[in-house]
Amino acid sequence: MTDDLTYIVTPDPVPTGPQLWEVTNTGTHHSHHVILNRIPDDVTAADIVADFGSLFSGTPPAGEPLVAQFTYVGYVALQSGGYTTWNAFNLAPGTYAVICFIIDPATGEPHVLNGMVTTFTVA
C-alpha cells in the first residue's frame, strides 16, 4: 500500500494454498486496509471502480451490481503509514481483488473511487 493509492501484489501469479502475507503500508499520508475478494475471471480493476462509483453516487447500475458476484475471502486491518502486519490466507485458484474503502478526508470519497483496487491471479 502506498501514498499513490496502489497495492503491489507479488509474486505474479500468487501461489495456491495456505500462505502468510506481509502487508506493509509504505506511504506516510494515508491509512489503508485490505478487503480481499474472489471475483469473476473477466472482471478488471476498472470495472470494480466503475461499479462502486455507481453505487456511491446513488445511482446503482442496471441489474445486479458487480459486487454481488464477489466472494469475501479476508481482511487486513487498518494500517497507518510505515506499519506492517502479517495475515494468513488459504487461496484457491482464480482471480482476486484487493480493495480499500477508507475515506479520504480531503475528498470525502473512499479510496476505491480513486483507483485503490488491484486484481491478481492465484494459480
Which residues fall in each region the model found?
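Extracellular/periplasmic metallocenter environments
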Residues: 2-6, 11-16, 22-34, 70-123
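Contiguous segments within soluble domain cores/interaction surfaces
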Residues: 18, 25-59
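Subset-of-secretome marker
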Residues: 51-77
